[in-house]
A protein has these predicted regions:
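M14 metallocarboxypeptidase catalytic domain recognition
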Residues: 18-447
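Bacterial N-terminal signal peptides
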Residues: 5-15
Length: 447
């Protein structure tokens, strides 16, 4: 059973104070107390949102209609033929209809039998405290390789923890080695992405003596950040049940909660495929980088010019996405576009996912990968992990999905680590992967 207290946001009252400290991770991850202060329960407004949320199927035959739906606040999680699906509140359904989009069905999610909870069926998933304990254990087992530090704090004061793997630099010390960053859980309900990041960290540390892995670890500066949105992910599992929460935990002026962190980055912020309605799941926030979580990612990446590759794990749909998301136009630099396509197509052969430019689904502005590429020239990908559909488990696919999803996605991760020195060589590099057994893909049964 989970024993850590789960953090809930206090929405009521004229004054809000969130300035409590969470013990920061030091550069070596040594003996840190990850206890979280106990806070008040959420307001009835947020509880009502949980109860009212529905799984909506609407007609979206083309990119333009899907973009229009996203701008109406609809967080599209699945596309099948000319239909788009996702979780929504009744007011979002009304906004879709007002925009001229046909809504075919709306199923109350609270009645779905697929819902599980961390304390029982999904106890193998890691909450915030358990993830921190796992990272501390990795540091203790390999102190000359692994270190941890906080890239910043969440809205409610939790440390956003990074594990660093580098044989010659610890903590925040600079490094000349080619760097790569893996990030997960921008969206609260995407817990499987946290597990993917944790298992990747564990695999690299535990296999550090193998020649192929040792070669990567000795020549790269690797950062793994398992949870960009710790406040939201902790709320999503509060009360021994899932809440289908997507955003962070900032209280908005209308008593709704949260900003979509993957619409809050600064490149073409809040243009296409994002909403300025605070109650919408795709709410872009009050300004670019208004949220401490996205601001922390910005500061972290800007301070490390050696990072050449970024992979952001999301769920679900089994997709490999690359810029641009905000526009239908492709990347203008021909060599870079060729490298992106080569990397995406090579990784798709490894995990069986579908590779494509992000905007092929629908245009969405203000996301991580667009900003990282535009502002810093970092080759950036989004993986929408398994499963493929809500009907296969959606955001809450159960414990068996952890191992199968990691098995499918280890080789792509190692492939990217290997290319971090020069992604432009991808078209000629083939699909050689260091440190991964040559195994067939085993299929598993939202950006």
């Amino acid at each position: 059973m989970r024993t850590a207290e789960l953090l809930i946001v206090l929405l009521c009252g004229p004054t809000l104070s969130w300035a409590f400290p969470d013990p920061a991770f030091d550069s070596r991850g040594a003996s840190l107390d990850l206890g979280v202060p106990k806070m008040a329960s959420p307001s009835t407004d947020l509880a009502a949102e949980v109860a009212d949320r529905l799984w909506v199927t609407a007609v979206g035959p083309d990119r333009e209609s899907r973009t229009l739906a996203s701008e109406a606040g609809f967080a599209i999680e699945e596309i099948r033929g000319n239909r788009m699906m996702g979780a929504a509140l009744p007011e979002t359904i009304a906004a879709l209809k007002q925009a001229g989009i046909e809504v075919e069905s709306a199923v109350p999610l609270q009645r779905r039998a697929t819902a599980k909870d961390f304390p029982s069926e999904d106890a193998s998933f890691h909450n915030y405290a358990e993830a921190g304990a796992l990272l501390r254990g990795l540091v203790a087992s390999a102190p000359r390789l692994a270190s941890t530090f906080s890239i910043g704090r969440s809205f409610l004061g939790r440390d956003i923890i990074a594990l660093r793997l580098n044989t010659s630099a610890q903590g925040t010390a600079p490094s000349a080695k080619p760097g790569i960053a893996f990030m997960a859980t921008h969206h609260a309900r995407e817990h499987l992405s946290t597990e993917m990041a944790l298992l990747l960290a564990q695999h690299l540390v535990e296999n550090r003596a193998k020649p192929e892995i040792a070669a990567l670890l000795g020549s790269r500066d690797i950062y793994i950040i398992p949870n960009i949105n710790p406040d939201g992910s902790e709320y999503d599992i509060e009360g021994d049940r899932y809440h289908m929460h997507r955003k962070n935990m900032r209280p908005n002026g209308d008593k709704s909660v949260g900003v979509d962190l993957n619409r809050n980055y600064g490149h073409h912020w809040c243009e296409t495929g994002a909403s300025d309605n605070p109650r919408a799941d795709t709410y872009c926030g009050s300004a670019p980088f208004s949220e401490p979580e996205t601001g922390s990612v910005k500061t972290f990446l800007e301070a490390r010019p050696n990072i050449k590759v970024l992979l952001a794990y999301h769920t679900f749909s089994e997709l490999i996405l690359y810029p641009w998301g905000y526009t239908d136009a492709p990347i203008s630099e021909a060599p870079a576009l060729a490298a992106y396509k080569a990397m995406a197509e090579t990784m798709a052969k490894m995990n069986g996912y579908t590779p494509q430019q992000s905007s092929e689904l629908y245009t969405a502005s203000g996301d991580t990968t667009d900003w990282a590429w535009a502002a810093l020239g970092i080759y950036s990908f989004t993986f929408e992990l398994s499963p493929k559909s809500l009907w296969d488990g959606g955001f809450y696919p159960g414990v068996p999905a952890i191992a199968t999803t990691f098995a499918a996605n280890l080789r792509p991760a190692l492939y990217l680590i290997g290319l971090a020195d020069d992604p432009l060589r991808a078209p000629a590099a083939g699909d050689a992967v260091a440190g991964a057994e040559d195994r067939p893909f085993h299929a598993n049964s939202g950006r």
